[in-house]
Amino acid sequence: MNNEIKFLIDTLTKNLVLRVIKDFGLSVKEALDAVYNSQLYDKILDLETGLYYQSAGYNYQLLHKELVKGKI
């Protein structure tokens, strides 16, 4: 993974965590746990999916669905 991709993933992850904190009222630790332990995060790290390149809004829709319904 090159530095550009790592930067995109890190920035996306930060934005997802901030949205989870805002929308679900979780602490920073709880939001980090929710994002890092999600199926979506695993898919973001799988570069073949291309999710790391999609917008935070698009990825948040998937994450929100997973957190509410338990699946993507």
Give residue ranges: language-model regions.
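C-terminal alpha-helical interaction appendages
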Residues: M1-I72
